[in-house]
Amino acid sequence: MHSKRGRARLDASFAMVVAGFSLLCCVSLACFFPHSMMFDGASAPLYRSFNSGFGLASFVGALAYGVAVFRFPKLFFAGALAGYAMLGAGCALLMAVVGDAWVAVTAGALCGGGLACAYVYWLGLLTFMHRRRAMTAQGGQALVGGLAFSLLSLLPLEVARIAIVAGAAVSCVCACVAWWRMRASGEASIAGLQEKGGVFS
């Protein structure tokens, strides 16, 4: 049985996971519908260029991250940080796209690869939770993330851009805090977390 203080810490950790995952969901939707970050009047070829890079890199990124963590579990957190760094760079580059298709492809590849790693990280955290909490977190991130993205359409483009980048940054902070809480609880290895049921149960 958890003490009241321990239960409060678990609830706070769970809320942080939902918040971080939800923000990442919002950013991912912004990448799926890049009009929220591209300049007004961007051409259809630019959108196709971005989507081409995004789709291929998403597949490669998720596969590479999964294989790497399977072979070297310590890369679980480092890979997530690398993913967030790629995502940030991709968003910044996408916002700077003026008319160069190759820049759009590069931005798409960075966003796709970065999102893949970050998403797999959060999905990995769900496996450390009690089943009911994991299902709630999975549904909650889609609901809250989708709602947040819909609200972006009410904002001017420049404000929406800032909100998207800020959301990615806060999501990264949540990812770092979640990992720190795991290590502080003595659950330093992926194998140990899986065997003991995790720290968010």
Feature-to-residue mapping (PLM):
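Pair of pore-lining "gating" transmembrane helices in MFS-fold secondary transporters
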Residues: 3-51, 198-201
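C-terminal ends and interior cores of transmembrane alpha-helices
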Residues: 84-99
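Hydrophobic core of transmembrane alpha-helices in multi-pass small-molecule transporters
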Residues: 101-119
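Symmetry-related core transmembrane helices of the 12-TM Major Facilitator Superfamily/SLC fold
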Residues: 162-184
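Intracellular juxtamembrane helix-capping segments at the cytosolic ends
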Residues: 115-130
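Glycine-rich segments within core transmembrane alpha-helices of 12-TM secondary carriers
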Residues: 131-156
